[in-house]
């Protein structure tokens, strides 16, 4: 796109698109590249990408991330995919561990992180799990997105990005995940 955000060509002649899980595919790479090469431009690129994804995909009304933004629509598109939202917040959580405290964009990334966490907690089910389609409680609870959200919430509490009141949602998620593990240690 003109603003430099990373996109991919979508199948079926749908043009270019921004897909939520792509952020996790590139952000950790750029963060580690910045660290290994001692070149902050790669960290800055990861930060800008994260901020752009939030701007393109965040639904301010539903407080969730759309899974796709298609150039032809000029708007977010698709479901509130649980796993995709999980990959998004995993990328942002990982990114926050690399951004120095004095970086001029740190607070902006932290604000997006907190906004997302506040939105996702609203969708947590009674058992502590999240559904594969986040705004559809009739769709099955999904282990991988529940694990990602639980990790990111508890990491935020431990790092001081979230206050201790978020610990309850994190432990509720953990208890929910434990109900999915059978006696052989397999996730069911």
Q: Which residue ranges define each predicted feature?
A:
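CBM-like carbohydrate-recognition segments
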Residues: 1, 17, 136, 141, ...
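Long, well-ordered core segments of solenoidal/helical folds
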Residues: 1-7, 40-66, 110-128, 169-186
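Carbohydrate-binding/catalytic loop surfaces
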Residues: 5-21, 63-84, 127-148, 186-188
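Well-ordered alpha-helical scaffold segments within catalytic/enzyme domains
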Residues: 25-39, 87-105, 148-162
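Active-site mouth of glycoside hydrolases
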Residues: 30, 50, 75-76
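A short glycine-/small-residue-rich loop at the edge of a beta-strand within enzyme catalytic domains
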Residues: 79, 83, 100, 104-111, ...
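Oxyanion-binding "anion nests"
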Residues: 89-135
């Amino acid at each position: 796109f003109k603003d430099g955000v990373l996109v991919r060509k979508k199948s079926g002649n749908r043009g270019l698109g921004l897909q939520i899980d792509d952020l996790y595919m590139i952000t950790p790479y750029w963060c580690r590249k910045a660290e290994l090469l001692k070149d902050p431009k790669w960290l800055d690129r990861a930060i800008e990408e994260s901020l752009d994804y939030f701007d393109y995909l965040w639904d301010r009304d539903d407080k969730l991330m759309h899974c796709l933004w298609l150039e032809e629509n000029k708007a977010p598109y698709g479901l509130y995919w649980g796993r995709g939202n999980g990959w998004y917040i995993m990328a942002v959580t990982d990114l926050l561990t690399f951004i120095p405290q004095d970086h001029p964009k740190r607070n902006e990334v932290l604000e997006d992180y907190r906004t997302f966490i506040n939105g996702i907690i609203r969708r947590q089910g009674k058992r502590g799990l999240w559904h594969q389609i986040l705004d559809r409680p009739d769709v099955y609870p999904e282990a991988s997105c529940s694990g990602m959200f639980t990790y990111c919430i508890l990491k935020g509490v431990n790092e001081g990005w979230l206050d201790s009141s978020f610990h309850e949602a994190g432990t509720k998620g953990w208890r929910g995940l434990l109900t999915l593990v059978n006696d052989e240690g397999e996730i069911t």
